Amino acid sequence: PFMGVILNIDNDHLEYYGTMGRLKMAFQKFALLSRTVVFNMDDRNTVDVVNSIDRPVFSFGINEEARFRAVNIQEYRPGFYEFDVLELGEQFAHIKLGVPGYHNIYNALAMCCCARPLGLQPADAERAAAEFHGTGRRFEIKGECNGAPVVDDYAHHPTELAATMATAKKMGYKRIIAVHQPFTYSRTKALMDDFAAAVSYTHLRAHETSQDLV
């Protein structure tokens, strides 16, 4: 790829990779295939990978040392954020997200980071962030049930699930019902405590998958 973007590295797909070390090696190989690497400076595992490669890099985060940094973060409506982006301490853009969720601040920072080497202008980044209203199965509102919004999200890892639940909670809903479909029993078994913590304040119903029980 011309530009590789690493948002985070978490303990996922370990049934294939076996260890975090081998998972990091896979990301290292991906980064080495890229001419330029854009990475999240707030994620320790990602920083470890980037420190092991010799490629031009652009960092982003809330970390003061990141090249592209989010500051003055505020909610302009429940669950939706706006903030200033600094590049090397200087104003780059003011981002107003069209999608909910604190984690999307990092997605927008990655986008701003990519804009610079691609020759795009700050206004392009601002417009893209404001006009993007999500993609399929990422906090996608499918309809309503008795007046309550029904949201579909492909959060199949505890970290993702926690972000989805936090977004729903920040949007002010008084009652959150989580319908969880485990996409592999092996992952669910290995990370059961983390899954439980992610949905600890919701009503939970689990659906089966086609994988054999473990």
Positions of PLM-derived features:
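Charged helix-capping and loop-helix junction motifs
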Residues: G21-K24, K189-A197
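Structural beta-sheet core signal
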Residues: F39, A178-H180
